Design a protein with these regions (language model features):
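Conserved active-site and cofactor/substrate-binding residues in soluble primary-metabolism enzymes
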Residues: 1-5, 21-28, 68-72, 76, ...
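Generic secondary-structure signature for well-ordered alpha-helical cores
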Residues: 11, 15, 34-42, 82-87, ...
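Alpha-helical support elements that line or immediately flank enzyme active sites
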Residues: 23-39
Length: 212
């Protein structure tokens, strides 16, 4: 694996997001879908069905949606419908009042847990032949159908994950761009602790996670 391939692979995995990823995936599915509709959904008439894997259902049901400060799938979907973001970071910018309007009446959303593991989110708009499926990665659009037309974005295949031997080779190369990406990610993930070097902070974080 080359440093360029490693950077591309890492960049596909490092996605900035406010809040937990399962609710964000639900919101992202709704946001992506309604962006392609000819007009904004009307809270009085909009209807949707959400089919979601057991793992995602469990995690999204207990996570709090930022700004709304409310747990659950309905809040995530409502935030997605009210989001102004075009990226996976859907909770970073949304119309709070509009989201609360969708939350007042839960009848518009039918939630169907399905016996699947991992990440699977499918949103269907009844009667419109319009739907979206996220699967695998939280931001990966597996299928997008708009009024019966397949509009699935075509992504360039990612490199295969490196073997342990390739990881060591990459580390020995000390590629400046790869190291800059890693440092940026680490410093975002590790909170500053006075009196400890960055290396010590990283070790403390790893130790804490490994010990639960």
């Amino acid at each position: 694996m080359t440093p360029r391939e490693a950077i591309r692979l890492l960049q596909s995995e490092i996605v900035q997001v406010v809040g937990c990823t399962e609710p964000a995936a639900i919101a992202y599915a709704f946001r992506t879908l309604v962006r392609h509709l000819p007009r904004k959904p009307d809270p009085r008439s909009f209807r949707a069905e959400l089919r979601i894997s057991q793992d995602a259902f469990r995690n999204a049901s207990t996570a709090v949606v930022p700004h709304l400060k409310t747990r659950g799938i309905l809040a995530a979907a409502a935030a997605g419908l009210a989001s102004r973001a075009d990226s996976f970071n859907v909770f970073a910018d949304f119309d709070l009042r509009r989201a609360r309007t969708f939350m007042k009446n839960s009848a518009w959303l039918k939630i169907v847990p399905v016996p699947r593991r991992g990440l699977f989110v499918h949103v269907q708009l009844p009667g419109l032949r319009t739907g979206i499926t996220l699967e695998g990665r939280h931001d990966h659009v597996e299928k997008l159908v708009l009024f019966g037309e397949d509009r699935t974005p075509r992504e360039k295949p990612l490199p295969k994950p490196p073997t342990l031997g390739e990881v060591f080779k990459l580390a020995r190369k000390r590629d400046p761009q790869l190291e800059a990406l890693a440092l940026d990610f680490i410093t975002r993930q590790v909170p500053a602790e006075k009196g400890f070097s960055l290396e010590s902070q990283i070790a403390r974080r790893i130790s804490g996670r490994m010990s639960g």
